[in-house]
């Protein structure tokens, strides 16, 4: 992916911050965790890792920091545990700052 809109992805975190109090007040903590691990940790970081934007790494770091704050113990999160094994592997790698390895695995999988 060769676009340079990495910083625009930070809007996702603003939306998540607006969504969080509503979901927690309604007793939907697990649903919020689902959004964090799927949309922030998996989709957004994986998409950003493919970009060539100069600020890509700092934006990925912001997403990873957000995931750490909202889901401090990833492997104990019920939403994480409910995911398929391959998705959990990519989430785990993204959570721990190994998004390049995650992208390598995904690219190899595409070619097989």
Where do the language-model regions lie?
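Nucleotide-sugar-dependent glycosyltransferase catalytic core
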Residues: 1-15, 48-58
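Amphipathic, non-membrane alpha-helical segments in soluble helical-bundle scaffolds
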Residues: 5-9, 29-34
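Amphipathic alpha-helices of TPR/Sel1-like and other helical repeat/solenoid scaffolds
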Residues: 12-22, 63-70
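Short helix-capping and hinge/turn segments at secondary-structure transitions, especially at repeat
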Residues: 18-28, 46-49
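Flexible helix-coil transition and linker loops at the boundaries of alpha-helical arrays
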Residues: 24-33, 74-80
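Short, charged, amphipathic alpha-helical segments
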Residues: 31-36, 57, 61
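Amphipathic alpha-helical repeat scaffolds of TPR domains
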Residues: 34-47
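Membrane-interface aromatic/basic loop that binds lipid-linked glycans or pyrophosphate carriers
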Residues: 53-112
């Amino acid at each position: 992916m060769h676009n340079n809109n990495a910083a625009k992805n930070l809007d996702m975190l603003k939306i998540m911050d607006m969504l969080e109090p509503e979901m927690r007040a309604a007793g939907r903590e697990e649903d919020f965790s689902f959004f964090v691990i799927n949309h922030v940790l998996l989709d957004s970081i994986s998409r950003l890792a493919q970009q060539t934007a100069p600020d890509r790494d700092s934006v990925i770091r912001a997403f990873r920091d957000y995931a750490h704050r909202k889901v401090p113990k990833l492997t104990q999160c019920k939403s994480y545990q409910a995911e398929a094994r391959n998705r959990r592997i990519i989430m785990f790698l993204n959570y721990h700052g190994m998004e390049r390895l995650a992208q390598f695995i995904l690219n190899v999988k595409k070619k097989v």
